Every structure is written in structure tokens, then in C-alpha cells.
A protein has these predicted regions:
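Walker B catalytic acidic pair
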Residues: 299, 305-307, 317
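Conserved catalytic/switch belt of AAA+ P-loop NTPases
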Residues: 315-336
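P-loop NTPase nucleotide-binding/switch module
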Residues: 171-209, 213, 240-295
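AAA+/SF3 P-loop NTPase mechanochemical coupling elements
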Residues: 270-271, 290-299, 329-347
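Peripheral, non-AAA+ core regions of ATP-driven protein-machinery
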Residues: 1-218, 222-228, 330
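Helical "lid/switch" subdomain of P-loop NTPase nucleotide-binding domains
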Residues: 230, 234, 290-293, 306, ...
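Walker A/P-loop
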Residues: 218-262, 319, 324
């Protein structure tokens, strides 16, 4: 009994399609996951088993093998729970396979079968649109973020049983839609404003010139003179984000799980890392590469408060991202490029 469900994984700030192949054969009960899964993916077998049982379905007491293709790329995160569960039910004949190849599925499962939000929903929705899928099934918590992508049906699911009934044509999942114009008009607001600064005319003039030309700026002054306050208000006088800029910035925040309740990042980011930050924390890195502060400040402002306190090697690694507007992290298996076009403000 073999079934194939389509899902997606993130590489850099973009996503690619992953084929979740489920094979159920006779033998002693076992659950094996292959295709370079990380710890969260390997642990999904226990979540999937409990979710299927607690949703009212029978978990097959046989040998189950799950392959995540392409098998030469590292798969991470809990977003494969939902496609694995649907694949197991499809292999046992409990899910109609006719519509499976037309939809991407992503989502983490709780033990009671509820579908929980996952990281990277926006780039995955873009991958679904670019590869010509009819739609993508996402957790309810990711639906508004994914619906920012035009040209693909975004279907929100709150429970595994809903997804099963959708593929069996006994339940409809209504598409989620959002108005980009309304999102920008509501969310493109700052809690602080540049006009709150009284006095400091020469500094304000320098910041206005810096904002107009996209120039980096260094502020020097005694403690308490307002350097940090002025830097925090600099994004409020920068031009508003275009939709393309907002989409690119949102992709970075989406894969880091920093979206919260927002559907899109509609304001210029402001990042102020502590002076004890490492070079990997600043430009990105790690065993499984992740974006750093320079990428989280993409299309916004990176503020280096107490710049002399930063370690020399940390300041040195800023040179290439500032010059190129991107940072490339090379590992033995792959090379990943993150965007890092920002205004640097130091004090």
C-alpha cells in the first residue's frame, strides 16, 4: 500500500516541493522516516500516531516507511506532520487520492489532531503558486500570512479530520482571502514618531538626509543625549514599503517564526542587537543556517548601540552584507543566500 502526498520545505528564504511517500507493508509494527529528517521530523511518528487515533481513525499495526524526497536535502521542522498523517490514511484507503496531487499540505499536529501553525508558510505558498498547484492547505494560524500570495487557493484547516473530509468530498475548506490594501493601511503604522523629538535640529537634519539618500550614519554624543531615541524613530520617516519589499521582508520573518498575528510586515524593520552578539548571530549561520540580524533588518534599520563595545570580528563581518545587500552562508552540503539591504545606524 503506497501513497504520495505533497508538502514543502524551506531552503534559505525560498521553499521547494517535498514528496511525502508513505509505504505500508506487512510485518512487525514499526515507523521509519528517511530522507534526511532532523530531530523534529523523526519525532513526528509519535505525534502522527496519536493524532490519527484521537481523530477517530485506525492506525495501521504494520510496518510504515515514510520517505521525504528529494532525499539529499535536510528536512527540518514539524510541518510534515499533516502530510504524513494524510499519507498514512490514504495508504490504508481512508482518504480519496484523486485530489492529493493538486494540493500542498503543511502543518504540525497536536496529539488530539488539531493542526498547529508552522514556520515558513509564506514561502511555501509562493512555491505552491509557482509550481501550479490548485491550492495549499495550511493551519488556521498561518492562513492570513499565506493568503497574501495571489494566484493560489489558501485553505485553512484546524483539525486533521477536516482535511480528511475535504479530500473525501464530505467537507469544504473555504479559501482564505485578504485585502493587501487594507493590510497596509491598518498595519503600516508606528507606535512612535519622528515628530515627537523636540529640539536636536542638527541631528534631525542629518537623519533626514540619511533617510533621503539611504546613507549609513554614525551619531556621537554623551549618554542621555537622545541617540537611541532618534535612531528608533528613523524608520518612521523612511519611504513606505512597497509590496515586493514587504513580501521579501515577510519571508525572512516567516521562516524565523516571528510573524505573530501579522499577515505581512508592513513597516520598516528596526533591529538593535546587543553588543555581546556573535558574528553568526549578526549575519546568520549555525549548523542549520538561519538568518541573522542583518537579514531581519532587511529593508529597514540596523542600529548598533555602543558600537565600540562590539567585538572587532563582529564588526568586520558586516562589510560584505553592507556592500552587497546580501549575505551568503556556505556549508559543506549547500550554500544559502539571505537578503541584507539595510541602513546602518551606529552610536
Amino acid at each position: 500500500m503506497l501513497a504520495k502526498v505533497l508538502s514543502s520545505a524551506v531552503l534559505g528564504i525560498d521553499a521547494y516541493v517535498v514528496e511525502v511517500e508513505v509505504d505500508i507493508t506487512m510485518g512487525l509494527p514499526a515507523f521509519a522516516t528517511v530522507g534526511l529528517p532532523d530531530g523534529a521530523v523523526r519525532e513526528s511518528k509519535d505525534r502522527v500516531k496519536s493524532a490519527i487515533k484521537n481523530s477517530g481513525y485506525r492506525f495501521p499495526p504494520h510496518r510504515i516507511t515514510v520517505n521525504l524526497a528529494p532525499a539529499d536535502r535536510k528536512k527540518e521542522g514539524a510541518g510534515f506532520d499533516l502530510p504524513m498523517a494524510v499519507g498514512i490514511l490514504a495508504a490504508t484507503g481512508l482518504v480519496n487520492r484523486e485530489k492529493l496531487e493538486r494540493y500542498l499540505l503543511i502543518g504540525e499536529l497536536s496529539l488530539d489532531g488539531k493542526v498547529k501553525p508552522t514556520r515558513g508558510a509564506l514561502p511555501m505558498a509562493l512555491a505552491a503558486r509557482n509550481d501550479g498547484f490548485a491550492g495549499i492547505i495550511v493551519p488556521e494560524g498561518n492562513s492570513r500570512e499565506s493568503a497574501v500570495v495571489q494566484g493560489v487557493n489558501v485553505l485553512a484547516a484546524s483539525h486533521l479530520a477536516q482535511v480528511v473530509e475535504f479530500f473525501n468530498d464530505t467537507c469544504e475548506l473555504p479559501p482564505t482571502t485578504v485585502s493587501i490594501q487594507d493590510l497596509f493601511s491598518r498595519d503600516a503604522r508606528y507606535d512612535i514618531d519622528f515628530n515627537e523629538v523636540k529640539g536636536q535640529e542638527h541631528v534631525k537634519r542629518a537623519l533626514e538626509i540619511s533617510a533621503a539618500g539611504g546613507h549609513n550614519i554614525l551619531m556621537v554624543g554623551p549618554p542621555g543625549s537622545g541617540k537611541t531615541m532618534l535612531a528608533q524613530r528613523l524608520p518612521t520617516i523612511l519611504p513606505g514599503l512597497t509590496f515586493e519589499e514587504a513580501l521579501e521582508t515577510t519571508k525572512v520573518y516567516s521562516i524565523m517564526g516571528l510573524m505573530g498575528e501579522r499577515a505581512v510586515v508592513a513597516t520598516r524593520p528596526f533591529r538593535s542587537p546587543h553588543h555581546t552578539i556573535s558574528d553568526a548571530g549578526l549575519i546568520g549561520g549555525g549548523q542549520v543556517p538561519k538568518p541573522g540580524e542583518v537579514s531581519l533588518a532587511h529593508n529597514g534599520v540596523l542600529f548598533l548601540d555602543e558600537m565600540p563595545e562590539f567585538r572587532k570580528n563582529v564588526l568586520e563581518v558586516l562589510r560584505q552584507p553592507m556592500e552587497d545587500g546580501k549575505v551568503t552562508i556556505a556549508r559543506a552540503a549547500t550554500s544559502i543566500t539571505y537578503p541584507s539591504r539595510f541602513m546602518a545606524v551606529a552610536a
